[in-house]
Amino acid sequence: MDTRETTRETPQGRSPADRSLLGRLGSFTVRRRWWVIGAWVVLLAVMASYASGLTDRLGSGGFEVPGSQSLAVQRDLEQRFANQFPTTALVTVHDEARTVDDPAFRAVVEGIAARVGAVPGVGGVQSFSSTGSPAFVSPDRRTTYLVAGLTGDQNTQLETVPEVAAAAREGVAAGVEVETGGAAAFYERLNEISRHDLEQAERVSFPITLIVLLLAFTSLVAAGLPIMLALVSLGVTLGALYFLAGVTDMNVYVTNTASIVGIGVGIDYALFVVTRFREELRRGRSVADAVPVTLATSGRAVALSGATVIVALAGMFLVDIQAFRSMAIGSMSVVAVAVLAAITLLPAVLSLVGHWVDRLRIPVLRPRAAGGEGFWHRWAVRIMRRPWAFIAAALVVLVVLAVPFAGIRLGQPGAAILPADESPRLATERLAAEFGAGVTGPMEILVDTPGGAGTRANLERVDRLTRALQGDEAAVSVQSLTSVLPRAGLDAYARLYAGGLDGVDPELAPAVAGLANWDRGADLARITVVTREAPESEAAEGLVDRVRDQYIPAAGLAGQARVGGATANNLDLSREISGQLPVVVLSVLALSFVLLAMAFRSLVLPLQAIAMNLLSVGAAYGLIVAVFQWGWGESLLGFTSEGHIEVFVPLFLFSILFGLSMDYEVFLLSRIREEYLRTGDNELAVARGLESTARTITSAALVMVTVFAAFAAGRLVPFKEIGFGLAVAVLIVATLVRTILVPAVMRLAGRWNWWMPAWLDRWLPRIALETADEDRPATRVREPAGA
């Protein structure tokens, strides 16, 4: 291979603070440490005081797809139909000994209806007694349910649910089972359990994390600093999100996702910085010099890692789903705050602590001497002797783990994500068992009826679609304007609706009141379909597709009928995500490539890093599908598989996993590059880089796994999926990728690792990562031709 000489000079005798922006920032934090610490204390105090009110500003929605049929139907039902409450609570009543025909049982139901109807925030209650509709009674007549319409905004509705549940159970005799379900009850319990799981995860993860940090640092002072940084980052971020939630819709998941990410990266970033600071002190630097050098090296790696994570999360903005964007905002915010704290607050604290960073040692633990050819140096040399064999073995493992990902199914979270003893889940299971799984999320079809829903021409259009639906085996029941009277013809229906709702027989009026917007022009007819399978099932999704693609056009209603409801919303959401996922992935990869190329002055290293991270993400996805969608981990992790992965998890996980995977890659490659610039020897640089970062990266990975596993141990399935996915991905990156693929691939690439065309090197902006070591001599590095 043709080579040419390239000289890279390291200035002699200059202070590290004079050679880099972060070095100068480090010098500033040393000189003004009390001002920096004071500013952070004030900021934390202010933000923490608002953080406690964040939950009240979060909503449960945001998963609707703008411009979709499902969203159009939802808005029409809310705005154009009288007494059609957008949110309801469903109260199930079951008596094993009596039926609804028993006066005593009926009295119980009527008493529940009266008490629930009197709860502030309940706009009305429908039941078998009030409507006479047989749809409210199970086939064995031992179960019925009531529908309570909730008024007010979303937070008011969620606050009303516990009162509805309490009123429903008040004074009910033993033997009568009363449960409260529905969307509002589901999200009320979801919020409460989410809050509890977050607190539990923090209580569990921090003590274990402290133990890991003590093993890594052998000093209580050094071990406490990363936890301090994580808590500060999280407290400031949650306070900031309180204000952001006041100007934009934020989903309830934002608290947990921000916490998962914030605790992990906050501790990791601090661990990298504290480790380097201690190394510089052991090299004989003064505290005043060690801080700027630390920021000029590990501080830069932290900033680059944070930027990569933020870039990856920013890809979620390409999907036009508000819930995704709110989770991205929360996670990006906590990463940005963690980076800012790691390069300002932490250096100020380190300058104050100084050599005390190594005090309060644990007697039984001894600090490991820096340098030398230890285990990881010898391991890297062994890998680089047979790179192809180790690459092949690692690839086989990663590909096998990724295989299940090919069969991934996305779905909206259902009641099964709640613990088995929660009332909304019990109510949903009762409804599914007695009335059909689809009753908890019926399909809603709105048909345009210009001139009035009760005209014969419009009734004929509605009837064609109704008959097509009744003939589909996936539908259990179909309610429409032409299905309320057995064996009635269109002429009879036309006479029935000739005078609008006012002309309908009073006994029949409750059954047809919601089947058209009678008091708002009667220009919309409604068809409600209960599916045989659950709303999130493939069978229900198939019915939505048939209605849209076959039944509506065949009925002559193309462009005049829209399909909504839970299944349609899930289908629209899944397809929006699937359609945008390639755009998100390519955008994140492209931006990450540019960022890494600017930092490492190489086109080969970014390609290697991206390829390895994609392999680790794919393996993590495959494990998530096997454990949660296939149900392999039900008994171990304590959940009930719904046969799908929650719809927001893959996209969110890609952004987080890709960004976090880069943490270790950037930290390792930064050290390898330092050694390469110092020695000009690629293999020696790889071995030394792996050796010098091994303990830190292993400790950081253990911290991450601890934090993520604590969230995986929670009670909500979506966060189990996220916590599990993040934990296994970190394990894969810290083991297969860092210890096998990186040294093997870099050995094969040789000097091409550092290749960049000279013209591009001049044109591309720099994010310098060179060491700030004052004592490093100038080195002459031979690079491949064309660099």
Question: Can you annotate each of these PLM segments?
Answer:
Residues L54, T88-A89, V93:
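Short, conserved active-site loops that position catalytic residues or coordinate cofactors/metal ions
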